[in-house]
């Protein structure tokens, strides 16, 4: 019986190897090679998160310790006016291995995993840059995302800033003018329930996810800012408040309809926020939209090391 099991495992391994598309040295990652990529983003010693092979963000570890299972609900999306399936998260499909065993998965939790994504994608690493390319036959726009770290050789100070940059390149592949809305959407993942106050504050062309500390737990304090350099940016600082999955569902409804809703900042208990950048592409035209993230967590809960 043991021999049969060993033979079966060897056969399976050989079959898997033969069925896989061979990847050349330093080439793009595609297909199965993208499934467990986690490219670190963040300045030296400032905490970090990762961009995955699909373009998703995970491993959110900005509170002075690794938190590799922390995948907050935050995502970029595109809405193309006049296309039935023209609203997509700017990521490749969720890998199968992530769909089972996720925290609280018995309750149906999975963040944005059930929302439509681009079908074709690839990943390429050129540290400090990570590049994700996206395409889908239902969307007349090809997308290239370049994410980068503040890594500057011989400049350790600026290389140690708690910031990250994302540049989205949109190319109109159709023969018609395309009207679209880029958005970035995030729940307030800085919130620590029962500890201080959580709210979402205003920033120029963006928003700040905030959590205050307390006298006994100052380490709960933290800010995470998401913003663009585009003056046409519209910001919704306060998602719909409801039970279960209502806030995210209403957020997605707004995206599908191309609605750029505006709500004021500073309301305690705000669930999430979105920013929107409308744009138009002529046939064959390419346009870039830049997004930035920065964070500040001044106190640590760690007592060792």
Which sequence ranges carry the predicted segments?
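Polysaccharide-binding surfaces and accessory modules of carbohydrate-active proteins
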Residues: 150-254, 302-305
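Short Pro-Gly-centered flexible turn/kink motifs
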Residues: 48, 178-180, 279-295
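Primarily extracytoplasmic ectodomains and periplasmic/lumenal surface modules that are beta-strand-rich
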Residues: 44-48, 53-59, 175-179, 189-190, ...
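Extended, loop-rich substrate-binding clefts of extracytoplasmic carbohydrate-active enzymes
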Residues: 99-163, 240-275
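Beta-strand-rich N-terminal accessory domains
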Residues: 17-97
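C-terminal motif of bacterial Sec signal peptides marking the signal peptidase cleavage site
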Residues: 12-13
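Sec-dependent N-terminal signal peptides
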Residues: 1-8
